[in-house]
Amino acid sequence: MASISDDGMALSGNLKKLKTMKKKFFVLYEETSTSSARLEYYDTEKKFLQRAEPKRVIYLKNCFNINRRLDTKHRFVIVLSSRDGGFGIVLENENDLRKWLDKLLVLQRNIANSNGTAHSPYDQVWQVVIQKKGISEKVGITGTYHCCLTSKSLTFVCIGPEKTPNGEDRVASIEILLTTIRRCGHASPQCIFYVELGRQSVLGSGDLWMETDNAAVATNMHNMILSAMSAKTESNTNLINVYQNRPDLSHEPMRKRSSSANEASKPINVNVIQNSQNSLELRSCSSPHNYGFSRERCDSLPTRNGTLSESSNQTYFGSNHGLRFNTISGIRPHSTNKHSNSPTFTMPLRCSESEDSSISVDESDDNGSFSHYRLNTRTSETAIPEENIDDFASAEFSKVTEPNESDENYIPMNPVNPTDAIHEKEKADLQRLEDASLHFNFPEHASEKLAKDFDLDSDNQCCRPIRAYSIGNKVEHLKFNKRLGHLNDTGQNPNRVRAYSVGSKSKIPRCDLQRVVLVEDNKHEFASNRSQSSIGKEGSSYGSSANRQKKSTSAPLLSLKNQINSDRMSDLMEIDFSQATNLEKQKFIKNNEIPKYIENVFPKAPRTDSSSLTLHATSQKDIFNGSKLNNTAITSEDGYLEMKPVGNGYTPSSNCLPIKVEKLKLSDYQTTAPPLLTATAAPVQDLNKISTYNISAEKWREQPSRSEEKKSNSPLNDNPFSLKPTNVESKSKSHDVHSANQIDCEKVCVQSDKLNNLTDKIVENNNLDIGGHEEKKLVHSISSEDYTQIKDKANDFTKFNEAGYKILQIKSDSSLISSKLYQKGMHKDNLERTHRLTESVNTIPDNATATVGSSSLTKFNINSVKPAADSRSTGTDPSTAQNILQIKDLNFPSRSSSRISQPELHYASLDLPHCSGQNPAKYLKRGSRESPPVSACPEDGNTYARIDFDQSDSSSSSSNIFNT
């Protein structure tokens, strides 16, 4: 080895070049005034002595890293990394390696110090070739790079020019944090190493594929980078690694990843760090120089105050010792922290506290004595009780004697009796200490006000440290006062409460709410409590919210469990679909005085002051609108559909059925009366469009022949009708037709039981619709057994000039099948239907006129009609079948009319088709099976009926009804 000359030569010797493993003569020069520090090598020592040109000169100022390389098959290798590439030197032994490496590092540090730059060496440096794959070409990082590893990041340094031969720019240097690397791996046969980056990396998400010199380098890169990613501790400096001869960092403990489990599931750390001379500062060991401590990522703890027995890796302080230590449960040294110094609170698990969601080990650097609380690093205060301190029993301080301990700051965990006066002095002293810490200086909120708010209930605070609430909020003090019997008013106590879900705060059964809360305040009103809003009706207010004036809050205050508060549901919307009580129904029925001898489905309503009993052919919307305008006594139950079973003794609900079932005056049906039905629906020329019953206009003009012959033999021939042809185009005669069409069914009061039985079975066709509807409608069958009448007390009806009730029963049978209007081949079926129709149907002439005396009533003449098919077959005049209603799409279901054999019926209100003003139809009395629905409500078109959903069959329906 040559000696150091005057030109600054420091070391020289025959070493091997890593790439070729050939011996070369290397000379290391220090920095001089004329030249900088450099490393030169020659082919032989002879050429060096001959002052020949060196084969290569490496300036140390261009080397960004000099370290030992451990990934080759040679043990003692030093690598100098620069922008021109890496240069490796293979030495013969460890001593030579340390001598050359130390000298190189000293010269490098001197250069960095002279330039005023900080030298940050890399732990590992590999030379790789990044392939054009993944995101490399997108971000411009392709070609030969140095892959430099540190404890925090992975840096790629460009080798060679910063432009590709194609003229594309290359990234000179880029640093990727290890925390943004999702995974890494290698392929041994192909010498490929890849890294998958996450979205938070500087390059974005994607893969980087790089090629190494050999498979050993790829394996070493994988192990080193993965160990650095998961290592718990930082790697040491290169110099320490070199002198300790540590091949890699794989033996280091793995770094703990972030965990969401609780402390009970975490492994126990048995390392107890103590220092009896000075208090140690515990910090997160992210610095590479903190060799004694391990770095941990933040752990997601349960969001509540943890007790000392379940918390690990936290800092505790002893009041008599100036040191800190990191410990866990079960290994706490008894000499430094006593068992009595555990101010833990038992908090309910349902409550959460955001300030203890994660535990930090960063503490202050003071060396004074500390209290026995587990310090919370996010606030300046000490341990904080839960915000709902009323969920557990309030505690007071009790005196616990302990040697060398002060009793002022001790917090016992014993329950206390609020009425005990022994500890009043201790509470007063502690309250003064607590008031001393209340120093608030906010511009919007005076400190006196906040101090007063915290002093509302000193006993409930339990003399514990005050919670750091946000500005303007207060502590809840209600439950403790309620236990003492002092229930604060809602408006005067705007304390902070917890929000509850809908219905969760109701402490009494729902039936009690209906009986007490909803009905007790309004015993004489029949409107139920819907949505707690006032239903305006002539200025009156319904429901229990009528007397409320306080505005509901978003989080209502809780009340006592044994007290029914009228404001319990003040902030919630509750819809009550229950019916009124039976007592209310009985009162309502008694006030309206419904006759007992009438089988009612609809309640009686008082007669309003209307000008005339005009029948309106309106829609369902007009019916309900008219009922609202004409009668202001409608309850809030009008829209309900009563579906309860009806028996003999059943009284329907008075709140769920529409009112406006008016009694008919006998004088309204006189022939001299003005017309009662106004033609407003359809023109005259549309007479043939009558719902699904296509009745031609010529049929209405035919002279009745057979009905006149049967008229004299009718048992109701007291007041015969004048049978005249009806001219539908004449206005005056149209009024006569309409007046005849308005007569629903007069209730005849006679002494003969036969007459009563006959008039009980009269059915009239009042539902012919000329509104132009060509759509098919469901054909219903009407049983006249449901037409009820007043069997006695005729004097009462004559006195009040009223007619009785009439109830329709519409029997909807599944056998009623409607076919198309213009279906072919229906002539034969129509003949059969007409034959069946005329055998049991009695008709009434067009113009039914009668004179109503002061003491007599109008009686209908029921005429027996022979089958129309017979008249056609024998060649009789077609006028003999003048009033037979031709029905196209009608099947005839059988229905039993026996009241005793009927099953239990379910009733509902039904809006039936109505008659228009141009209806020229006579009141055709037909059998129950063939009759369409008939209007039952005289004044405003309210047509209601009972619906029988029974599917039973009986063929004796019409015969039982019309057996005269």
UniProtKB/Swiss-Prot annotation:
GO BP field: cellular response to starvation; determination of adult lifespan; germ-line stem-cell niche homeostasis; glucose homeostasis; growth of a germarium-derived egg chamber; insulin receptor signaling pathway; insulin-like growth factor receptor signaling pathway; lipid homeostasis
CDD domains: PH_IRS (cd01257), PTB_IRS (cd01204)
Chain span(s) of sequence motif YXXM motif 1: 410-413
Keyword Cell cycle: no
Residue spans of biased composition, Basic and acidic residues class: 698-712
GO CC annotation terms, alphabetical: cell cortex; cytoplasm; cytosol; intracellular membrane-bounded organelle; nucleus; plasma membrane
Compositional bias per record (Low complexity), positions renumbered to this chain: 952-964
Residue ranges annotated for the IRS-type PTB domain, each copy included: 122-236
GO molecular function, one term: phosphatidylinositol 3-kinase binding
PANTHER family on file: INSULIN RECEPTOR SUBSTRATE, INSULIN RECEPTOR SUBSTRATE 1
Quaternary organization: Bindings to phosphatidylinositol 3-kinase and SHP2.
Name of the protein: Insulin receptor substrate 1
